[in-house]
């Protein structure tokens, strides 16, 4: 249910309540029994003859009837306690909200501020050099490419004392002589399994216990192109994947409302939904509603791409009500702060925007640090030039100042800042192709190579990283994108927009991109950014968001099936059995969109009796292939031995239980052909006596067979 704690709020009630025939359940991991990991259980009909099906759940508390949703107060901040338990962080006052944070909007157009305020957390600095608790000196290096790791990633760091421990008044979380750990990558490299790692391992297993025989069979049936999908996900496997940089848990320490999830090629393929206002349309109310709506249908993360007024306020409302990771493109807001003129952008303005969003709790930033001055001319002969908003902003800045991008030259500082809050990098593809004519050109791949260099720097700084990819790519050029990304970026998770496989279908680009998304997900892409029917045409509304999410859930699931993910096919098989058994309600409920499935069925067969009918409106009652198959099975089960023998002979197959002698005669002495003719004549007569009807009730057939036996 929804309530409003403040009667003056303009926020509408968001969509709550379970999906059809579903309920929220919670798995309790053995490693941390205090954790409650959410799953959605699809309740099957009484006649199903099989257990209910648990599936991955992204909906947060919004589908839990036991939780009262109050968007004005926000969700419970359960994860904040986990962060504080680990130590190595401090609570502080944070920066004040400035007028430019909301685009200097006037009072008449200002959105209502979020009512609750939470002091932000940040990672503690290392003890000063020369003190008893000072860390070893960092490796020398300057600018991009010069950073080194304090401790090699292969060297285990000391285990932290309980509750983060303290020595001589200095907080630490990785031993008294090293700087405090903050990020999931740092903990993973230290051999420490966090609660977030335990949580996501349980989610990935979809509530199943170890079923190794079936899991290994599924893996053997798939083609993973070199991925290392496990038969069963353990917290240790999660830790090892994060330590290697092959997976990330985007989880800002200030996003206490978050239900952790993992992004990596060896886990379930995830999808992202984009929302956000613009200078000409949408509002805070609509964007919060779209976020809740997107996760209801399966979005694993949401990016707030707001570019209009009230950006800070919109983001605060979204974050405080978001159980999933929230990403942003900070350059959008920075541009609003300088009146939309890219030439006026400065490093100081951008850095202040990063701090603002880190304190709010944004989980990952798209940063277009790979758009270098030397690459811009490579786009001159493109059909569609630079289509990334962030890429075009930085390209214009570079040309106007004829300098290297400040995102590139200050990358070390960006890493240091993001590490303090465990904000993950989503290294942006500012030079991605905007048409299939530009796919895989030198500009695109030059930027990708630079992103690989930046990935290593971010890793050395302790930051989690994923890489953004295209874009518009025809089918035959998709795999090279995946292969090159894995090679250049050290297997960091890949996150792509589609790709769109053709440019001829405005209004249907959720389909043109869904095709490419399924393929690149199969090849190893870890997260797919959805495309809606409004792509290239306008800002998506609520219905467009749903269509985009469902389309990409299909693509992600198809890629998981192809990779041989151990649990992926459980839902397919359950729905197939329901379809064959004519359990219509189970068919609807096992689908990704039960409401639409039932609505389509009911357009032509609206009566309740049709929900149990053994046919649909496509074939009708007399031509349903599955009904015919069921009749054949029932018929065969009731045949006597003589009838089976006759049918076998007529079809040229073996006689089964009725033996045949070497002389070519049946055991009762009759010639085989005579026996067959007699049996066929008997069945012909039976057909006439039963009314010469092609389709018969199965029970009547069984009764008739008893008389013949």
Curated annotation (Swiss-Prot):
- Mind telling me which Pfam families this protein's record contains? ThiC-associated, ThiC_Rad_SAM
Q: What class of enzyme is it?
A: lyase
Which cofactors, by name? [4Fe-4S] cluster
Q: Which organism is it from?
A: Rhodopseudomonas palustris (strain BisB18)
The protein's name in its UniProt record: Phosphomethylpyrimidine synthase
Kindly state what the record says about how the cofactor is bound.
Answer: Binds 1 [4Fe-4S] cluster per subunit. The cluster is coordinated with 3 cysteines and an exchangeable S-adenosyl-L-methionine.
Statement: the UniProt record of this protein carries the keyword Nucleotide-binding: no
- Known catalytic reactions: 5-amino-1-(5-phospho-beta-D-ribosyl)imidazole + S-adenosyl-L-methionine = 4-amino-2-methyl-5-(phosphooxymethyl)pyrimidine + CO + 5'-deoxyadenosine + formate + L-methionine + 3 H(+)
User: Which residues of the sequence carry a binding annotation for Zn(2+)?
Assistant: 472, 536
Q: Per UniProt, where does substrate bind?
A: 274, 303, 332, 368, 388-390, 429-432, 468, 495
